[in-house]
């Protein structure tokens, strides 16, 4: 076998691309090893100072088309007056050529929010898009207003992927 990557931080999500190691039409085997060393445990709180051991979360293997988005995240930033916001969206892509990303923002009521700009060309590598949102409904424990951000990836005018994220301002 071939070592692909190492990840430190057992409680953080991570992904890795195994495409270069897959042999189409042949038997492929993926092995995941967990090392939980007692001498590598933080004693920050003095509580629960013991090895955890094993895989505690789901492990998912998924296939993506060559033109795709990964490491997607969305952040909301409110202005100093706590009135208007900017929705900052980041992601990466291994390939770009002729692809674009389109966004739809749906209010908690189900009404589509009118975005000033909703389509962006997909660039190879890291991408960052900013969507200004005027006076969005705010999220708090008593008013859990969540918007739905729909992300659509298209290439040469044809939709090749779509997913949603729930967003609070």
Residue ranges and their predicted role:
Residues 2-169:
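Secreted/periplasmic carbohydrate-active enzymes, especially glycoside hydrolases
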